[in-house]
Amino acid sequence: MSQLTINNVTVRFGGHTALNNVSMAVESGKITGLIGPNGAGKTTLFNVISGLQRADEGEVTLNGKTITNKAPYKRARYGLGRTFQRLELFPSLTVEENIRVSGEIRNQWASKERNTHTDKSIDEKIKEILTLTGLTDSADYHVAEIPTGKARLVELARSLMQDPKLILLDEPASGQNDLETAEFGQILQKLTKEGITIFLVEHDMSLVMSVCDHVHVLDFGSIIADGSTDEIQSNKRVIDAYLGSEQ
């Protein structure tokens, strides 16, 4: 079952077409990858999905609801979470405090709608997420004191405090060493077992090929291939456009 569908999405910036009639589906409970060269349109597509960029044409649906013209905060209420390529954290706050802020924000709009999603307290939820992301021992450190690899986990933890059904991850392995990337992949696989769908943009092919159930490839704003990791790795057009430079 598709949790997210993108139908014929086109985005233009002046005379430049950033996305050209893009269509794809992200299956529920799976890890889907989006790869392609720099400037292919990957982040632009994530911005369209999350409501930060208006599409000139096309439609986006999430959990069966059309969200094409919805504000970003409304998409979050429909179960969409996101992390960014550039870290969006509070460096002067601790890891635990950064995560707590996200939970408090979620509780504010949930209480207004009389929709609590869960009867867990914020403290219980934070403890659970710290354990899941391996951040328990770093909880009292200020974000400015931890390495980038761990800061990426804090971004993920903050998103999880929103109780998302689908999380968009924009280059989550950036700044991580090989061990951190492997551990991050294991966390993503745990999340799918809990029913959370993952859609990630990533240049680290070791992460993409080890965790993704399905991969889409963008080049010059158009989808040039999609399939399993094995199919993508053996696709000549993909190799010529992108993977060849990674080998």
Where is each model-derived feature located?
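Glycine-rich phosphate-binding loops of nucleotide-dependent enzymes
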Residues: S2-Q247
